[in-house]
Regions:
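A short beta-strand motif characteristic of beta-propeller blades
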Residues: 31-37, 81-87, 122-128, 167-174, ...
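Conserved beta-strand positions in repeat-built beta-propeller and related beta-rich domains
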Residues: 39, 55-68, 105-111, 147-152, ...
């Protein structure tokens, strides 16, 4: 009898263990977070530089034409220490920034400012764009600088082969895209965020948030890379709809995009797999106001504009 009971007992224990032991979790892992607050006042963009990050600040809540407050400045944060690299005095509306070598390009209203980061105390070179263009974001690819104007819906290119001498460089119209926000370039492809279509004749139940891409940078044409309807049809979920995407950056291996998402009640950080085009939320917080983010040192740095901080997410 014992010979028959022993195998049965072992099988019984196996079944019980399957029921009791926890199954592997498929829930998303919340990344470790920290924040930078020292000196930050209305920051809209962060970029990596020399083992740290450059943080652009308005210094004031006013960032519209006609509000002539020269309060903008650039911070540099490295190894837990923050210093003012470019103090107030020139910049009015430093929104997007980009770096090539030791040169910093700053979108400043209708002006593009070019600073030598080894000598930030020197006056910047200035390229003034024709009105009514209002500069939003910047991205570098080799010797080309891309600059977006969100109020008109235009992306420009500038030749930055010789950033030390920009006096004869003129911006060239490159791509028209209504509501253009931010850009990320890698492996010969540009990815773009833009405001969703709106207006009195637009059916809001069909409005989509779209990530655009340009596959041929020499012959630019915007095409939809990813789209998702703003309204899902679920009344509970639609109380916190995604209003628009803003910041966008490539992962260090160029296999994914990280995107900032402005929602009705929360702000969220999304990751979009470039190969599968699957999107998921990696971080969400009530009141988060995420702008143009960047990735460096296996972490995301996200300017949280209205909350006067830069959020750091460990990846």
């Amino acid at each position: 009898m014992k010979k028959f009971l022993a195998p049965f007992f072992v099988f019984f224990l196996f079944i019980i263990s399957c029921i009791i032991l926890p199954l592997p979790s498929h829930a998303a892992v919340t990344p470790d977070t920290s924040e930078i607050r020292d000196g930050i006042r209305f920051s809209e963009c962060v970029r990596p530089y020399d083992g740290g990050v450059l943080i652009a600040n308005y210094g004031s809540q006013h960032k519209m034409p006609g509000i002539d407050e020269i309060k903008g400045y650039i911070l540099y944060q490295k190894n837990g220490q923050t210093k003012t690299l470019i103090p107030p005095g020139v910049l009015q509306y430093p929104s997007g920034i980009a770096v090539k070598d030791d040169y910093l390009f700053v979108c400043d209203g209708e002006h593009l400012r070019v600073y030598q980061l080894q000598h930030p105390e020197k006056a910047p070179q200035t390229i003034t764009f024709p009105k009514p263009y209002w500069l939003k974001a910047a991205a570098v690819d080799g010797n080309t600088l891309y600059v977006s104007s969100d109020n008109v819906g235009q992306i420009f290119t500038l030749d930055i082969t010789h950033p030390e001498n920009m006096s004869r460089v003129q911006p060239k119209k490159w791509l028209e895209l209504q509501g253009v926000k931010c850009m990320a370039v890698g492996d010969g492809v540009m990815y773009i965020t833009a405001l969703p279509e709106n207006g009195p004749d637009v059916d809001e139940t069909k409005v989509e948030n779209i990530i655009f891409c340009v596959r041929d940078l020499k012959h630019p044409k915007a095409e939809t890379f990813f789209s998702r309807k703003m309204y899902s049809g679920d009344p509970a979920a639609d109380k916190n709809i995604s209003v628009y995407y803003e910041g966008i950056t490539l992962s260090e291996d160029n296999y994914a995009l990280y995107i900032t998402d402005h929602r009705v009640k929360t702000g969220a950080i999304l990751v979009l797999d470039i190969g599968t085009r699957e999107m998921r939320v990696i971080y969400e917080e009530e009141g988060l106001d995420p702008s143009d983010l960047t990735q460096t040192e296996k972490a995301l740095f996200i300017p949280d504009m209205k909350n006067h901080r830069v959020l750091k997410l460990e990846l």
